[in-house]
A protein has these predicted regions:
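Flexible, acidic/Gly-rich N-terminal and inter-domain linker regions that tether
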Residues: 1-94
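Conserved Radical SAM active-site core
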Residues: 83-188
Length: 188
């Protein structure tokens, strides 16, 4: 959720904008996996919040770690659909790159890519896209510094959700625009 969306939720719950900033910090700076971890919120408020919101909706189905430190995840969404997302490290630098998916399957069916062989199932929501990065951060305890849209799917065929995710990566995760890359098969 964007800060403005959290502020709207706080308004509906009769809470202050300050609470929205606290929750925003828990989500994006600390990558919590449950509302119960937001310990600077009162227990009563956390219970109220749990009635209207949830933090994580994905689970790691498979995790593979290579000898160079690259980690590949198969992330499962509540509807049972799965996508791959990868954490890459280069040259032992502090840069941590998340390769994210934008669709379940792909309609483009490029000859060099296995994803299209299974066909297109659906677009990911912007929340499902950002959840991939949050899943990586929760699992590793590390902050992702770069994003590449080179996972499953054609990002430009899911443009609205990709643009919303980009805005959150840039504004809320504090990842600079120069550290975000979108790869396309040629869709314009």
């Amino acid at each position: 959720m964007k800060l403005e969306e959290i502020e709207d939720l706080m308004n509906k719950l009769g809470a202050t904008k300050f609470r929205a900033k606290q929750i925003h910090n828990w989500l994006y700076a600390k990558s919590v996996s449950s509302i119960d971890e937001m310990t600077n919120l009162s227990k009563d408020f956390r219970e109220q919040l749990k009635q209207t919101a949830s933090v994580t909706e994905t689970k790691i189905k498979i995790k593979q770690v290579s000898s160079d430190g690259t980690i590949k995840y198969l992330v499962e969404y509540p509807d049972g659909e799965c996508v791959e997302t990868v954490l890459m490290r280069f040259d032992n630098r502090a840069n941590l790159t998340a390769c994210v998916s934008s669709q379940v399957g792909c309609a483009v069916n490029c000859s060099f890519c296995a994803t299209g062989k299974g066909g297109f199932k659906r677009n990911l929501t912007y929340k499902e896209i950002i959840e991939q990065v949050l899943t990586i951060q929760r699992d590793t305890g590390l902050k992702v510094t770069n994003i590449v849209f080179m996972g499953q799917g054609e990002p430009l065929l899911n443009l609205d959700n990709v643009l919303k995710a980009l805005e959150i990566f840039n504004n809320d995760f504090q990842i600079g625009a120069r550290r975000i890359t979108i790869s396309t098969s040629g869709i314009i």
